[in-house]
């Protein structure tokens, strides 16, 4: 089947479920596909997707766009179209498992004759999602719990694997205000950028090098870089090496301290006790002193692998003594002390 010069649009598509335990309505204004040539699609878009559950919550997505799609076989496209055409006549309970099975068939890793996982080319080149909203009560925009203006994933290559991801979103602090207070913050803006590149480590192991930045606006920025290793699909053998973390504090430590004890003088008195505890647990006085310096005057905290070639199993991150042996920690104090930052926080 070849419609390389055509754009095919289906919609609107509406699906509803009257099951008493989870009544649900969902709709997609339009699904468009263009540039189809058997196993390849140039572009697919879904416009104005909405799911309402029990008239109490809603998920809305302005647009989903996938480019340069490579399907598992030539028949997959026909099965997908058949399911879309029958969507209005199917219940959610029937439609969802069939759609999920088709997606998993396209996304699952292929294996060679030796049973090793392999792919001949990326499943898609780019996936972009715009204007995603999770709303507690449909129709009440002031109860928008989560809004993502932009999410994007670029699959740039297989030899080596290369991915780039980005996310810009904001979310309400309402769901956790009773457990965790952030004075002056009704919503938090989060930004994330990541670049993942396949490489071969010193021991000949296949690794993924991940670098990126995670930002909580007005709270903190985290720059990270590390090599990730895992051969087990369950990732129980997951390990990292050549770790680099740089935390730039813009108020996050003051918020955490406020939720432990809102009295600045109480937190100041707690610092010597914390320093003694850190020295004992980490087994490295220099690391403990760096953390205490950061907590006393939050500024920047840097963490590096002592030996960049040494793999650190994830389970060892739960062992303070192991962290003390494998990591080197340094700190640059901020301009204001923790009590001063807490007072400024409470003045908002």
Language-model segments: what does each one mean?
Residues 4-348:
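Glycine-rich, small/hydroxylated-residue low-complexity segments
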């Amino acid at each position: 089947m070849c419609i390389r010069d055509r754009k095919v649009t289906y919609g609107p598509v509406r699906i509803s479920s009257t099951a008493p335990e989870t009544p649900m309505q969902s709709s997609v204004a339009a699904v468009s596909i263009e540039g189809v040539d058997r196993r390849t699609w140039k572009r697919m878009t879904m416009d104005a997707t909405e799911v309402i559950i029990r008239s109490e919550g809603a998920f809305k997505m302005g647009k989903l766009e996938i480019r340069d799609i490579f399907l598992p076989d030539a028949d997959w496209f026909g099965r997908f179209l058949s399911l879309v055409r029958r969507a209005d006549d199917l219940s959610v309970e029937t439609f969802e498992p069939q759609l999920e099975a088709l997606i998993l068939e396209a996304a699952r890793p292929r294996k060679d004759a030796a049973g090793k996982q392999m792919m001949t080319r990326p499943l898609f080149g780019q996936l972009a999602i715009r204007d995603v909203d999770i709303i507690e009560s449909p129709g009440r925009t002031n109860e928008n719990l989560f809004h993502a203006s932009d999410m994007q994933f670029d699959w740039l290559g297989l030899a080596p694997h290369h991915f780039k991801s980005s996310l810009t979103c904001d979310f309400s602090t309402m769901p956790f205000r009773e457990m965790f207070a952030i004075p002056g913050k009704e919503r938090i803006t989060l930004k994330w950028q990541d670049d993942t590149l396949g490489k071969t480590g010193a021991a000949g192991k296949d690794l993924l090098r991940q670098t990126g930045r995670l930002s909580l606006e007005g709270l903190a920025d985290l720059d990270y870089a590390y090599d990730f290793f895992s051969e087990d699909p369950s990732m129980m053998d997951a390990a990292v090496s050549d770790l680099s973390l740089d935390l730039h504090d813009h108020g996050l430590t003051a918020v955490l301290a406020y939720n432990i004890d809102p009295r600045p003088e109480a937190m100041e008195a707690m610092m010597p006790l914390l320093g003694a505890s850190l020295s004992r647990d980490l087994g490295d006085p220099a690391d403990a002193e760096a953390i205490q310096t950061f907590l006393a005057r939050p500024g920047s905290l840097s963490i590096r692998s002592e030996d960049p070639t040494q793999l650190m199993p994830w389970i060892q991150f739960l062992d303070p003594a192991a962290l003390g042996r494998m990591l080197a920690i340094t700190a640059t104090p901020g301009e204001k002390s923790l009590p001063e930052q807490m007072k400024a926080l409470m003045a908002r």
